[in-house]
Amino acid sequence: MPYTLDEHDQVCVLTIKRRFLGSIERDALQQTVDALIADGRTRLVIDLTKTDFMDSTCVGLLVQGAERLRAADGDARLAGMQTRVKNLFVMARLLGRMFDDYPTVEAALQSFAAPVASRQA
C-alpha cells in the first residue's frame, strides 16, 4: 500500500507516501475508511507531505471518504499539501468547502481540539 495509518490521541493519520492513483488504490482506501468507521475512529488527518502527484479519481475518493466520516459524526482534514497537489483541490473548489487544509500534521491534529464551522456545499 502506498500509505500508512497511525493514531495520535484518538485521531488517525493516513500518510500517503508517493504518487497516489485512485484508479489503482480505490479498493484499499475504501476498505481502510470503512474499517475506521466500523471501529468508531472517525477523525482523520490525511498527510500529503510526501505526495507529489494525485489523480482526480483519488480526489474523488478522498471526498467520498470525508463524506462517510462526517456521516458517522467524524471529519477528515488535509495536511502538508505540496503545490501541485493543492492546485487540484483549489481548482475543484474543495478547500474550505469540503476540506480544511493545514500546513503540518501537527496543526491538523490540534485543530480537532477546536470546533470547526460547518461547511456549506
Question: Where do the PLM segments sit?
Answer:
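A charged, well-structured terminal subsegment
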Residues: 100-121
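General small-molecule cofactor/ligand-binding pocket signal
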Residues: 6, 79, 102
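A short, hydrophobic secondary-structure junction motif
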Residues: 12-14, 32-44, 108, 112-115
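Short, solvent-exposed coil/turn elements at secondary-structure transition points
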Residues: 11, 19, 82, 105-107
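Short, conserved active-site loop motifs that form the nucleotide-linked donor/cofactor pocket
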Residues: 11, 99-100
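Amphipathic alpha-helical interaction surfaces in cytosolic regulatory modules
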Residues: 20-99
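Conserved catalytic submotifs in the C-terminal HATPase_c
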Residues: 8, 49, 106
